[in-house]
Structure formats: structure tokens, C-alpha cells
């Protein structure tokens, strides 16, 4: 796992979009976790999204899942040259989606407020994981957890 810095020319763009999505979700009254899927070849944004569990009464619309949903239908081969950006370490469900679609690279904004087993599992399956330790991501997530601990525990299945 790479920690601390941006490694690709699209990483800052991807993390900025993911954070914008997290902030939008928070403003809507949801969990502030955002994501973005970027094509590694040309930097095009294939999809972006944020956690919509509270807004839509959904059990599964985490930030990463919402991002993939907003990509629409893509050929399987498209995912093979992408990076998924997420503001928070992916949970088991989101890790499974990353593996299922063969997304080779995942850039994580922060893993202080939630440290899942997903990062390590992705690595064992051959996926690159980069944790950039983004202060914006840490701050908005901590603020949400402090304000709404029960909603946070519900979101992570506790």
C-alpha cells in the first residue's frame, strides 16, 4: 500500500471530485463519503457519486456503490483501466464491488475514521491501494461521526 501522496497525474482531480461529492452528501443530510471513477488513459470521469443511504432510504448506496451506479452500463473491459477514488477506506461491500469489476487501483482519502479490512484484501487480490491522508476527508467524516454517531454505526453495520 502506498501512503501519503498522489501517485498518478489524475489523482488530485479524482480526490477533489470525491471530496466534492462527500460534501454534497453531507449537505443533503447524508453520510459524507464520496467517490469518483476515472479512466487512467485520458482522465475522463466515468462516474461520480456519494453515499445516499439516508437520502434514498437505501441499505446499499454507499459512496463507492453510488459512483459505480452513476457510471451506467459499461463494458467490463472499461473498468480494467480505471481508478476508483473514495474519501474513506472501503467497507467489505464496496471492496467486493471493486474486485468484481476488476478496478485495478483504489485511491483512499483517509483511513483514520474507518479502517476496514478492505484495503488489505484488495492488495491480496492484486489491486493497488493508495491512501493519501486527505485532511478534508478526515475532518468532514469526524464531524459527521461526532454529530450523528448512531447513523454512522448504522452505515457501517454495527
From Swiss-Prot:
EC nos: 3.5.4.1
Record bears the keyword Zinc: yes
Location relative to the cell: Cytoplasm; Nucleus
Source superkingdom: Eukaryota
Binding site for substrate: 51, 155
Pathway, per record: Pyrimidine metabolism; UMP biosynthesis via salvage pathway; uracil from cytosine: step 1/1
Cofactor(s) this protein cannot do without: Zn(2+)
GO cellular component: cytoplasm; nucleus
Molecular function as annotated in GO: cytosine deaminase activity; diaminohydroxyphosphoribosylaminopyrimidine deaminase activity; zinc ion binding
Record keywords, A-Z: Cytoplasm, Hydrolase, Metal-binding, Nucleus, Zinc
Membership in a protein family: Belongs to the cytidine and deoxycytidylate deaminase family.
Reported function: Catalyzes the hydrolytic deamination of cytosine to uracil or 5-methylcytosine to thymine. Is involved in the pyrimidine salvage pathway, which allows the cell to utilize cytosine for pyrimidine nucleotide synthesis.
Other noteworthy facts: Present with 5180 molecules/cell in log phase SD medium.
Protein name: Cytosine deaminase
